[in-house]
């Protein structure tokens, strides 16, 4: 009997572990992250995540070989290194972390020192992502960041010294007090470090954040729409001239140093997740952990060995075929190479070009999208990437 090949959308291709602690919450942040927790709470949380890993050990059998690992937050680096080691070792013990693989950890430059970075490298993390955001001290202060520009540059250098060959940095444009000149200076200083991966995001004022309140009260002024558009263009042209490839709407790499982990998300392949508010996807449904740290810890404490009441620990969302296709197209079109329509046909039994012919026609005419028949991929053009959110709406099936 012929063995049918396991497709990448039939196994977990990545693992995300959420560490929701921060030294201080940034003004713009609406993620599930919390400041003010003491060392005991962090240790209790570590124990709870380790218990969740043990209770879900059977799921390790569905991990793809060399699936990527990602510790995100929050700020994972605020955890004591022994707690990070305990989490990493639990994943390895139960078969979730199979080396060699890409293993990334997020670090705030204000929490980085050489000893900590060397420990992270020794645990098997081979990629590190720094939340730099800006290299202008006034812009960092305006956003409530805990690090200075100098600390960020020092952290990048220390990561190299600790043995990290793969280093990424996040930047934000459209910040209060930011100008085209200050943004260019940040880009110049960052790329001068030799970094090979940069993620750049336009500032979004999320409802309910301190930033939104300050903007509403007129206490913070953001760059106007035209200036923000000029900043976007500056990012594209500057990084292109410095040899960076834009491989996703917000991500740029040199020498093929793409994020394998994030590529799993953009390919809409399954990934498993552990921790409070951590969101996983098995190819059919989304599973999100309890959002509050204390509730998550207490719920795990109540479980005995072999007892995992998913309804008590997770919110499970069953996705319809239409919703799956919608998200597949949203995510795939974020990538420069686009969404695979051959995979869409195999996974969802739909001919995208035929199903959305009338909606796509004007987009082809305006040269906002393009189709490559040789690869069967539909992609956004450079112009299309500027209005990506409007194009994504085409695939919303009501």
Residue ranges and their predicted role:
Residues 4-12, 33-59, 65-350:
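C-terminal scaffold of the Radical SAM
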Residues 14, 227, 358-360, 389:
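Auxiliary N-terminal substrate/complex-recognition segments of SAM-dependent methyltransferases
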Residues 17:
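Conserved N-terminal Rossmann-fold NAD(P)-binding element of oxidoreductases
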Residues 20-33:
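Local cysteine-cluster metal-coordination motifs and their immediate loop/turn environment
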Residues 350-364:
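Short amphipathic alpha-helical interaction segments
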Residues 364-374:
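A short, conserved structural fragment
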Residues 376-381:
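Minor-groove-contacting beta-hairpin "wing" of winged helix-turn-helix DNA-binding domains
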Residues 383-398:
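Short, amphipathic alpha-helical interaction segments positioned at domain boundaries
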């Amino acid at each position: 009997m012929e063995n049918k090949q396991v497709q990448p959308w039939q196994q977990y291709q990545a693992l995300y572990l959420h560490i929701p602690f921060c030294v201080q919450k940034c003004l713009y942040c609406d993620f599930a992250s919390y400041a003010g927790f003491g060392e005991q709470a962090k240790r209790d949380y570590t124990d709870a995540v380790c218990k969740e890993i043990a209770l879900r050990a059977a799921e390790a059998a569905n991990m793809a070989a060399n699936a990527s690992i990602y510790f995100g937050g929050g700020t994972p680096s605020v955890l004591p290194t022994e707690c990070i080691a305990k989490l990493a070792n639990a994943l390895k013990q139960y078969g979730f972390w199979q080396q060699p693989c890409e293993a990334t950890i997020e670090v705030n430059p204000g929490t980085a020192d050489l000893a900590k970075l060397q420990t992270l490298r020794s645990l098997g993390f081979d990629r590190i992502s720094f939340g730099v955001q800006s290299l202008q001290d006034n812009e960092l202060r305006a956003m409530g960041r805990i690090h200075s520009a100098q600390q960020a540059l020092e952290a990048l250098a220390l990561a190299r010294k600790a043995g990290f060959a793969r280093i990424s940095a996040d930047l934000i444009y459209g910040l209060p007090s930011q100008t085209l000149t200050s943004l260019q200076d940040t880009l110049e200083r960052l790329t001068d470090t030799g970094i090979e991966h940069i993620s750049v995001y336009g500032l979004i004022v999320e409802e309910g954040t301190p930033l939104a309140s300050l903007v509403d009260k007129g206490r913070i002024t953001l760059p106007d729409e035209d200036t923000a558009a000029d900043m976007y263009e500056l990012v594209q042209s500057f990084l292109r001239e410095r040899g960076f490839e834009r491989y996703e709407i917000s991500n740029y790499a040199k020498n093929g140093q793409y994020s394998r982990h994030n590529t799993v998300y953009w390919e809409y392949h399954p990934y498993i997740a552990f921790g409070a508010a951590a969101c996983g996807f098995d190819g059919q449904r989304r599973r999100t952990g309890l959002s509050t740290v204390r509730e998550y810890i207490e719920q795990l404490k109540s479980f005995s060995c072999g007892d995992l009441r998913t309804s008590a620990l997770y919110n499970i969302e069953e996705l319809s075929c239409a919703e799956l296709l919608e998200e597949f197209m949203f995510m795939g079109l974020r990538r420069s190479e686009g969404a695979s329509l051959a995979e869409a046909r195999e996974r969802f039994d739909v001919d995208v070009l035929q199903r959305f012919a009338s909606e796509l026609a004007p987009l082809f005419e305006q040269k906002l999208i393009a189709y490559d028949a040789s690869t069967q991929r539909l992609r956004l053009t450079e112009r299309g990437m500027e209005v990506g959110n409007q194009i994504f709406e085409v695939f919303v099936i009501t």
